[in-house]
Amino acid sequence: MAYNYNMHTSSRVAIIGAGVSGLAAAKHLARHHPQVFEASDSIGGVWRKCTYETTKLQSVRVSYELSDFLWPNRGESSFPTYVDVLDYLEAYAKHFNLVKFIKFNSKVVELRFIGDGKTLQMGDLGAYGNLLPGKPVWEVAVNTGDGDIQWHAFEYVVVCAGKYGDVPRTPTFPVKKGPEIFKGKVLHSMDYSKLQKEKASQLLHGKKVAVIGFKKSAIDLALESALANQGKEGKTCTMVVRTPHWVIPHYWRATVSKFIESYVLWKLPLEKYGLKPDHAFEEDYASCQMALVPEKFFEEADKGMIRFKRTTNWWFYDEGIEFEDGTTLEADVVILATGYDGMKKLKAIVPEPFRSWLEFPWGIMPLYRGTIHPLIPNMGFIGYVQSSSNLKSSELHSRWLSQLLDGKFTLPSKEKMLDQFLKEMHVMRRSSRFFKNHCFSTFSIQHADDLSKDMNLKP
């Protein structure tokens, strides 16, 4: 592979990724003429590469729209499909003329710090530094797919590569009890999402399917399997569930109260299928663990087309899956809806010493205002925190970052930024045992108020 070391400096700001967060960042940073690097040949991010035939938005249109670009037919009560969402994002990019900033088929493979030349230390907790110093701070290596690596130089880099997709998280198994001994087919949900509609249907139809997991992707896949197996030749799909989390009806309206558990248990047959979580609803809300149950999901379960098996440990045998209680499940296809390792993807491009600081201190990236890592200079992160509306969070963080780069306000010291993050983590630890994600749900209003105050806006 050839390396082209001729530095390209057409812009002061780079954006990595053209998904929801990347588009929002490009729109708000448009005055800086950002260079957006997108690894694929189109915009959309996870809505393009991690969706299935049954994938829909988990809210109505008005709850998932950018503030300056409204949905057409926004009053409809139906939930948009992933195709509708892609159409909306493409219309947004066209309306604000964002495509001119994007280099498609351009995968960022390496970042190189060329700032002040000094090795930064964890103990250096002074001022954050100049955001646009007038000279390059980062070199960005881009693979354009033609065997050539191009290097670009920028003063500021905004990472919007996302936490989902690209790097699947897969279970580990005892020796000689992994997928290699299974006679059927094993694939991750990421690989399934790449299949064309006809091939996906052929994979599922007439097959005994096991779906591992009980989050959004797993639930969508189980329903897709059930719908592909209608009729006499149809087979049952079994969901293998380790830790049930609270799920909510597709017509649920966002609210949390002491009555919500009773409401969900009244509306959904969680107890009937042994899916009632062992923890309070508020814990899942506080850690962004909830998933919305699509229409017809429990209808298919009632018909026997979706079954559930709760277990802590499982492994493969030649005909399917064996559980710790000694029971077995015959299967033709096993789909691992076990999530993604977004941090591994990020660590692959971020150099040391910054790579070692990405997950300091609790395995969660310490992002001040959900955007700035206090120990990584001249780099912002959009889309790496979760809330009740990730799209609106990405838009707000992008707007905040644009005003920061424009000098409308300044950052506090690194020490104060880290202290603010630690306070947020303490809130999460008190609210939920599932605090592996940086989730703003329980203090989203306060977070938005803080960002608005920085920007001198009325909350």
From Swiss-Prot:
The family this protein is said to belong to: Belongs to the FMO family.
Top class in the EC scheme: oxidoreductase
EC number: 1.14.13.-
Cofactor list: FAD
GO molecular function: flavin adenine dinucleotide binding; N,N-dimethylaniline monooxygenase activity; NADP binding
Keywords: FAD, Flavoprotein, Monooxygenase, NADP, Oxidoreductase
PANTHER family (alphabetical): DIMETHYLANILINE MONOOXYGENASE
Positions with a binding annotation for NADP(+): S217, A218, I219, D220
The name this protein goes by in its record: Putative flavin-containing monooxygenase 2
Gene name as annotated: FMO2
Binding site residues for FAD: G17, A18, G19, V20, S21, E38, V46, W47
Lineage: Eukaryota, Viridiplantae, Streptophyta, Embryophyta, Tracheophyta
